[in-house]
Amino acid sequence: MDTKELRGRKEALLREAEAICKAAEDGGRDFTAEERQKVEGLLKDAKDLKAQIERAEGDEALKAQILTL
């Protein structure tokens, strides 16, 4: 999977987390236990994708350096 696809997946996860936050906020309430668990899982997955993106970008930078030397 390329970085564009990874970014798209990460953004989708964050949009889903934001929607859950907005629903709780609009309802004038805290998260339910299920919502909290879901948001925590979404954030973990988004952080994992961010790390994958950073590794992929680092690999691309290394490859570019090899080609320029």
Question: Which residues fall in each region the model found?
Answer:
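Intrinsically disordered, low-complexity terminal tails
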Residues: 1-69
